Every structure is written in C-alpha cells, then in structure tokens.
Amino acid sequence: MPWRDNQDPYRIWISEIMLQQTRVETVLPYFINFISRYASVQALAGANEQDVMKLWEGLGYYARARNLIRGALRVVEHFKGKIPCTYKELCSIPGIGDYTAGAILSIAFNMPVPAVDGNVLRVIARLYAVEKDVTKLNVKSEIRALVSSIIPDGHASSFNQGLMELGAMICTPKSPKCNICPWYLICVSRILNLQYRLPLKTPKKPVQVVRRIIAVIFDGQRVLVHKRPSKGLLGGLWEFPGWEFAEDQKQSITNKLLQIGIITHKVLPIIEVQHTFTHLCWNMSGFLCITDASIVKVEENHEYRWVLPEELHDLPFPVAFKQFVLWAIESLPGFIHPVDL
C-alpha cells in the first residue's frame, strides 16, 4: 500500500482517516491524489476547505476531510508542524481517536500501542472466543488489553499491520479462511467451532427511507445551488435545493420555492434517484423548475449561489447528487430561455 512505503506519520494519519468505513480499493486513488496535492501537514494546514472537499468528493463521511484540515492547523500551531508521538497529544487533534492514535504510534513510531479497528476486534474476539458484544465500550477495552499483552517487543509496527491484514484477508466476517490462518492451532473459537458465530454484535437498526423532492432551478442561463450547513449529514457540500416530501402533506413545488424567492414558470419532472447512506435511504424525485432571472428574488449568499451548468463540476457535490449534476450539465445548455418554452 502506498501509505506503507515508509513510516511517515503524516501519510499514515491521512490513510487511516480515509480508511474509516471505506474499502481499501476505494481509498487508493483518493490517497494518491490527496498526497500529491497536500504532501505535508503544512500544505494541508494552508488548504482551502472547498478545494479539500472537492478532492474528497465521492469518498463520503465528509466530516473527516474538515477534521483533517483542523487537525493540520493544530499540528502546525501547537506542535511546530510535526505529528506528535504521544497518545494524549495525538488525541487532542480533531478527528483522531483511540484507534487512529494507536495506528500512528505503532506503525509510524513502532510504539507498543494497540490499534483496534473492526478487523482487529474480529480477529481477537475469535482468537480468544470472546462471547460478548464487541460494540460495547467495556468489551473493546478488554480486547485492547488483550492486544497489548501480545504485541512483541520491538515489533509493534509490523505486528499491528499484520493483525489488520489478517482480519482483512483471512479472518473475514462471513467466510474465515481458518485453514491458512497462522493461528489455526491456537484459535479458541475455531477449536470450539464458534468462528462463524463470533464476534457478537448488536443488530443494526433498519435503514430509514425518506422521500425527497430535488429542485433543479434554472433561469435560462444559470442554475441555483445550495450549500449544506457545515455540521450534519453531507456538511459543507453543495446540492440542489430539496426537501422531504410526505404523501399525506403535499405542498406544491411552486409554493415551496416561493418561500426562497423563486417564482416558477414551469415545473417538469426529470429523473428519479435513490441513494443509500449507512443509516438512511433517500428516494429523490427531480424536477426542473424554470424561472426568469428578472423576477428572481433569492439573493446570493454563503448558502445560495447561481452558477452556469458547466461550473457545477467545480463545486464539491456528494455522490447522492451526481446524477442530478450530470443531468444538468448535459441537458440545461439545450434549453433556450424560459419564455420560449
């Protein structure tokens, strides 16, 4: 992996943040592009947030990107531009928690500190046949202690990386390859035939399905985009204006747009898009809402902006809106002026 070409704590920090809730094959191109653009903590500390978000576009969990900028600023301002090598100092950096601190300390500095991610939780729960809910904090603490007890002196970096790889490639969630596992003879769950039942986890909550209206508002030349609040789902990213829609409380799109100062001439259905997050599913119905620039009352500010269709590519949009962005870029230039429609 490119982040393991050396023991640079900055590269390890970036990679570990990117790998949170994200597959390795997805992260690879993003990591290469990110490091090419921001090769040092100083470069990241001086970055424009929107540029970083654009580079992160499609990777998801966008708070990670904002925390990286905040973290880089803290490293530059409080640690003279050097990634600290103590657990307490690392955990004072935004976005760095128990696992990431352990990964940086063990991999970059070869310190005997456990780095317990989902893969390691699974491996250790099976190795010792831990028949407890591994999502509980006290159980995670127990597993951290078990990992600490088996880290070989002077080999924390290679051991922790090997443990992660073991979980990713051999001790997998549904089909563990016990016959080629180096711990085949001593794995308690294999001996007791529990490897397919462990680790124990609290069942996930069902995904909530939400219907949304997405308004692609076009004045004959430009399209209106909205910047989401910095905190919360898809924070700080751009979108087309939208809202939740319930069958039992219909409100016309025309009246809804009037609330933000948009008077529409025509409302035309365009595309249907479904996007699933970890805990949420959006069923989105898109509508082209045609207005006239001369009667638009909405003012540009930090939340709203009028842009040309071809400029949409320059803004960081979440994957959920990609199909709407592509539709707008490909279709809107073909429309003349709303009065001609």
PLM regions: where:
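Intrinsically disordered, low-complexity, charged terminal extensions of DNA damage-control enzymes
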Residues: 1, 5, 168-341
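Catalytic cores of DNA base-excision repair glycosylases
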Residues: 1-179, 183-196, 263
